[in-house]
From Swiss-Prot:
It holds the Pfam family PseudoU_synth_1. This is tRNA pseudouridine synthase A. Homodimer. Belongs to the tRNA pseudouridine synthase TruA family. The active site is at 51 (nucleophile). It is an enzyme of class 5 (isomerase). Formation of pseudouridine at positions 38, 39 and 40 in the anticodon stem and loop of transfer RNAs. Substrate binds at residue 109. It comes from the Bacteria. GO terms for biological process: tRNA pseudouridine synthesis.
Length: 259
């Protein structure tokens, strides 16, 4: 039997999603909790691996098991074995042809910037802070140059292992909600650090250090050195995954928080 789960987590205390030796990861914690409920070793596959410090409000995973359990065992039961910063949000039994990664048609991230001169004590993590005033309209103009299918070499880390840097951005929206700027970006897939490098570059535009057209110049350069700095991980959230409708997976509120 194959199950899909919706997972949310605060990435502050984890060295990313993927299981690794000698460090704490989200995948490790989830597999241990699932294995206790199933009373057998469980391995999971996720829709998109997140880096150290990155959060998720709707990561999607799948796993296989021959053990029959009530749905509440895979939600409430698993949550009792998870730390407070990782939680199962929903469960659905799926056909064997469902694959959390390969069945996905798009991934959606949101980056949250607290844009005030002084930092917040209450929201000391889970957001990024920029004390310089940011113009969301200029940032949106710059973001529009990224829409469509392009080579995003300029926006990936030099350590990116993907064979191709070509990706298709379906939307990239910059909006302000009070003191918060939200960069909402959806693509068929993302390169290593791609979202954070895009945001770091857009922040230069938002501060009028560069014109919106500069984003197109960076894109065409295909050179990581010409783009902006990598934005911090704590403001980044994996918020949604698109799948073909026939899988009928639950849809959660994108979030995070009140957004």
């Amino acid at each position: 039997m194959r199950y899909a789960l919706g997972i949310e987590y605060d990435g502050k205390n984890y060295c990313g999603w993927q299981r690794q030796n000698n460090v704490i990861t989200v995948q490790e914690k989830l597999e241990k909790a699932l294995s206790k409920i199933a009373d057998e070793k469980i391995e999971v596959v996720c829709a998109g691996r997140t880096d150290t410090g990155v959060n998720a409000t709707n990561q999607v995973i799948h796993f296989d098991t021959e053990k029959k359990r009530k749905d509440t065992a895979w939600t409430l039961g698993v949550n009792t074995h998870l730390p407070s910063d990782v939680a199962v949000a929903w469960v659905k039994k799926v056909d064997d042809d469902f694959h959390a990664r390969f069945s996905a048609t798009a991934r959606n991230y949101r980056y949250i910037i607290y844009n005030k001169p002084l930092r917040s004590a209450i929201l000391s993590h889970g957001i990024s802070h920029c004390h310089f005033a940011l113009d969301e309209n200029l940032m949106q103009q710059g973001a529009d140059y990224l829409l469509g299918k392009h080579d995003f070499t300029s926006f990936r880390t030099v350590h990116c292992q993907s064979h191709s840097a070509v990706r298709t951005i379906k939307h990239c929206r910059v909006t302000r909600q009070g003191d918060y700027l939200v960069v909402d970006i959806k693509a068929n897939a993302f390169l290593h650090h791609m979202v954070r490098n895009v945001v770091g570059s857009l922040m230069r535009v938002g501060q009028s250090q560069e014109t919106p057209h500069w984003m197109k110049e960076v894109l065409l350069a295909k050179n990581r050195c010409v783009a902006g700095v990598t934005a911090p991980p704590e403001g980044l959230y994996f918020v949604d995954v698109d799948y073909p409708e026939n899988f009928e997976l639950p849809k959660s509120r994108l979030g995070p928080l009140f957004l």
